[in-house]
Amino acid sequence: MKPYQRQFIEFALGKQVLKFGEFTLKSGRKSPYFFNAGLFNTGRDLALLGRFYAEALVDSGLEFDLLFGPAYKGIPIATTTAVALAEHHDLDLPYCFNRKEAKDHGEGGNLVGSALQGRVMLVDDVITAGTAIRESMEIIQANGATLAGVLISLDRQERGRGEISAIQEVERDYNCKVISIITLKDLIAYLEEKPEMAEHLAAVKAYREEFGV
């Protein structure tokens, strides 16, 4: 685990974005941990979040021309990541996002920001069922752009309805790489360093045994 990944876990724990306990997911599964990126909700939170996304992007080595944030959660993420890339990595790249409803006056259309073209890096909080990615792909393809990759905050590394994860489905269906700031594996490595969290470690490992990929 890299220093920025450890720092991200501590940041998420400090903001209660990442919690341990017993949580019922939309899928009906009982999970020993829960991640709610919506709780990164202040100016300082967003500034820090952008730095972690930018760090993971640079670390991945993937090449891209533009950041795309799907509405709604992806919008602030794309914005803060673009700022962090410019301020901390000297990479001044365009970004854009979509509107849920197309506008019929003014600039019109369903995109805001830069023109959607070239190699697109899609940024979002998490991938649960991959629905947002599929909707975004329609927009990207309609504009003649290509998907360079997807960046999310956490990869839960768990099976979807079949034998593979929603993330593996996205990688297979769109022939792209999905990268994340942290994975379930990183989370377990972090818990292993913390004796006081042994109870959570056991629960997370048991969950991975049952649902992991």
From Swiss-Prot:
SUPFAM superfamilies hit by this protein: PRTase-like
Entry keyword annotation includes ATP-binding: no
Family matches, as Pfam families: Pribosyltran
Catalytic activity, EC: 2.4.2.10
UniProt-annotated binding residues for 5-phospho-alpha-D-ribose 1-diphosphate: 26, 72-73, 99-100, 103, 105, 124-132
Molecular function, one GO term: orotate phosphoribosyltransferase activity
InterPro entries (alphabetical): OPRT, Or_phspho_trans_dom, PRibTrfase_dom, PRTase-like
Entry cofactors: Mg(2+)
Record keywords, A-Z: Glycosyltransferase, Magnesium, Pyrimidine biosynthesis, Transferase
Family affiliation: Belongs to the purine/pyrimidine phosphoribosyltransferase family. PyrE subfamily.
Function field: Catalyzes the transfer of a ribosyl phosphate group from 5-phosphoribose 1-diphosphate to orotate, leading to the formation of orotidine monophosphate (OMP).
Protein name per its UniProtKB record: Orotate phosphoribosyltransferase
